């Protein structure tokens, strides 16, 4: 995988930094694992905008990813690595010995032809999935479940990983990239190794149009709006907003704690590191 800085032959290419992966499949995705993906434009079922700055973009198919990795005891072969427009990580098309194909997240170092497996009897190597009770303490894992059988929820983006730092009774303690330490049931599954495509963080889109291709619309500053549109709006000439930064709905927007899930507080051993 190479990081290429383009020559400034135009304003849009002056700041363009591309991540080129020659190992990715050049053809179409596997049709049996595609699903329809409708555009919402950031609107909910009543037509109101619930997420700002969304709209347009290239048409996409959703790839059905196997986040449960519950096909135990059946070896699989990685057929190819593919680009997925729905996530930062690349995905791998795997063929199981019984003939079934599934998409999984491509682990760091995974290549076409690799053999992988799931279950308690799987070898301790990158790409294999098993319950946390069978993973050695100190191992680096990704695609971790929070509830047994629910499917992976933690460490799924490009370059992400979690470290297993302890195991005590029914729970394993994980250290997340944010610095948070969290308890997870030992029956939850995880995949060994890191998520691939870690160079994704080095890319630069280079121009606003590249954001539009991805369905991201412009973000307008509150101080550039009218008072009816934003708490920072209005005033004669340029202003600083006149108050601490808030969202369009008046909620403090820099460093304000919004988490209120007391039900799962008991599983957090240490909160994430402060920036």
UniProtKB/Swiss-Prot annotation:
Transmembrane segments: none annotated. GO terms for biological process: cytoplasmic translation. The keyword Repressor does not apply. Gene3D superfamilies: 2.30.30.30, Nucleic acid-binding proteins (2.40.50.140), Ribosomal protein L2, domain 3 (4.10.950.10). One of its GO terms (cellular component) is large ribosomal subunit. Residues 223-275 are annotated as: Disordered. GO terms for molecular function: rRNA binding; structural constituent of ribosome; transferase activity. Keywords: Ribonucleoprotein, Ribosomal protein, RNA-binding, rRNA-binding. PROSITE patterns: RIBOSOMAL_L2. Belongs to the universal ribosomal protein uL2 family. Part of the 50S ribosomal subunit. Forms a bridge to the 30S subunit in the 70S ribosome. One of the primary rRNA binding proteins. Required for association of the 30S and 50S subunits to form the 70S ribosome, for tRNA binding and peptide bond formation. It has been suggested to have peptidyltransferase activity; this is somewhat controversial. Makes several contacts with the 16S rRNA in the 70S ribosome. This is Large ribosomal subunit protein uL2.
